[in-house]
């Protein structure tokens, strides 16, 4: 009898771990992209208003990127040359707020920006991940626009939220 109960418990636990989750949708990807945009704008606003922009950036990295969920994250920011590929949360934070471990960083999020428009050209869904590629346009406080190209990969965390695990951004090639 005890053996039967133990087997049933183990079988139930194994099935709970391997049971498929709800598929990621285009709407899920759009929602996390909007949240990323809102967070980027919030970091800049806190900086401009004299608030704790570093805390907002840390909260953004913890909530939207996979670091706090135990995922490895590949981060290749738009405006980076000396340290183009970033493998740690500290290196990503340095890019956004500019006073970290990478001397070249000026604080991309401190511009500040007032809007980010995403234009996904394609999204690939595979199990508990989705990869989106396209162009996004950043509008700064003076109304100037900068277009960049991106590839973001999102992985579903244990709590069901999407986390950024690949962030690759670059400026368009000019002939």
Feature annotation, model-predicted:
Residues 17-67:
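Short, low-complexity N-terminal intrinsically disordered segments enriched in polar/charged residues
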């Amino acid at each position: 009898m005890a053996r039967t109960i133990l087997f049933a418990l183990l079988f139930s636990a194994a099935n709970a771990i391997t049971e498929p989750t709800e598929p990621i949708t285009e709407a899920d990807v759009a929602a996390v992209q909007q949240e990323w945009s809102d967070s980027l704008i919030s970091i800049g606003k806190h900086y401009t208003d004299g608030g704790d922009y570093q805390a907002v950036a840390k909260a953004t990295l913890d909530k939207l990127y996979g670091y706090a969920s135990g995922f490895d994250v590949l981060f290749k920011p738009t405006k980076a040359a000396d340290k183009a590929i970033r493998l740690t949360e500290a290196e990503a934070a340095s890019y956004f707020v500019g006073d970290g471990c990478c001397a070249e960083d000026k604080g991309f999020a401190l511009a500040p920006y007032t809007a980010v428009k995403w234009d996904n050209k394609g999204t690939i869904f595979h199990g508990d991940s989705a990869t989106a590629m396209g162009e996004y346009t950043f509008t700064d406080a003076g109304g100037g626009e900068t277009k960049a190209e991106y590839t973001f990969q999102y992985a579903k965390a244990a709590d069901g939220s999407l986390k950024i695990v690949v962030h690759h951004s670059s400026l368009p090639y000019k002939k």
